[in-house]
Curated annotation (Swiss-Prot):
Name of the molecule in the record: Ribulose bisphosphate carboxylase large chain
Biological function: RuBisCO catalyzes two reactions: the carboxylation of D-ribulose 1,5-bisphosphate, the primary event in carbon dioxide fixation, as well as the oxidative fragmentation of the pentose substrate in the photorespiration process. Both reactions occur simultaneously and in competition at the same active site.
Extra information: The basic functional RuBisCO is composed of a large chain homodimer in a 'head-to-tail' conformation. In form I RuBisCO this homodimer is arranged in a barrel-like tetramer with the small subunits forming a tetrameric 'cap' on each end of the 'barrel'.
Taxon lineage: Eukaryota, Viridiplantae, Streptophyta, Embryophyta, Tracheophyta
Gene name as annotated: rbcL
GO biological process: one example: reductive pentose-phosphate cycle
Amino acid sequence: MSPQTETKAGVGFKAGVKEYKLTYYTPEYETKDTDILAAFRVTPQPGVPPEERGAAVAAESSTGTWTTVWTDGLTSLDRYKGRCYHIEPVPGEEEQFIAYVAYPLDLFEEGSVTNMFTSIVGNVFGFKALRALRLEDLRIPVAYVKTFQGPPHGIQVERDKLNKYGRPLLGCTIKPKLGLSAKNYGRAVYECLRGGLDFTKDDENVNSQPFMRWRDRFLFCAEAIYKSQAETGEIKGHYLNATAGTCEEMIKRAVFARELGVPIVMHDYLTGGFTANTTLSHYCRDNGLLLHIHRAMHAVIDRQKNHGMHFRVLAKALRMSGGDHIHSGTVVGKLEGERDITLGFVDLLRDDYIEKDRSRGIYFTQDWVSLPGVIPVASRGIHVWHMPALTEIFGDDSVLQFGGGTLGHPWGNAPGAVANRVALEACVKARNEGRDLAAEGGEIIREACKWSP
């Protein structure tokens, strides 16, 4: 008879429910450089202590379940469990608190944003002991960052490809977003590009509909790009939306774009999914395509102040998954966006090292080491009179993406693009001369109007 091997599972196992805080609340824990750290805004059900709710979040997003199980003894919970290590109140909100949770790195698959989110937010948000839960921020350790390719190219490589320096880039979303034939769509692209824009863009829901199939759109847009390049002597691009119903179809569209010789494609990274986005990002790196990212569906996730995820988390995830541009809000346009908070996640997209700064919503210091940066795209509801503020707020490494602010010009698309370009160059020139864009912006634009055709 073979000898019996004694395990923890066979010694003193006690079935039953016990409080989460007995195992998962560890205020004495000192976080490791390799831990993924999360800041959750917790709104518990009445009568539940913060320590128990914070521990519940840590448990249900890592190794825990609602009861003690025999197989807990077959592993090392101390090694693999998430830990709620700190709790702090939310100023002005009596019923809310911030729970800080540390996750051991071994809980996550390397190079997979999909797995990271499945673990951290995949299940716990439906926990009935919580009235609401919001993931405010994540600290991604260097050890995990280094398992990701990140953006296909990054800011400096994009500027080198386009041969454009010292100013923000200009873009325009073609409108109406749905209903144009491919040929008329291409004409609209051409008019904008020849007028002075650097890019035009497919709207997020332009994929391959009966009125305009993707292949026809790609062909007519490529014609517009080459014609406008020949006329202006500048490199131009159109964000060809490769988003599709399957990853295979998405890659087929990206392959066709590469064969046409265009510089950039586009993906809706939230509706398309992180696995699809990372797949496309790797293809773009390997084949020299820039990748523009649209955040369609983000407000479903990030708009509520007490439930969901803040966009800074989605921005960090995009930098890991891969994209050269991403829409980031405008501060001055028609969509929501507080200046300091917006600039906080803009820095998280562009910079290599970002210090903790709670006034800007940054809960953790983030070191991206060698991961390339992402260009923020300011879009929605902006026009030439916003140009001084946009230039001051976003700086040179940005894309200012117009729509009606170009196409709504009474003389048409090309004059609208000229107006955008003249306004931008006037603001950049004034800034470089030391003028105050915030105080003198209106005067700068009026001066530019005198000489604009």
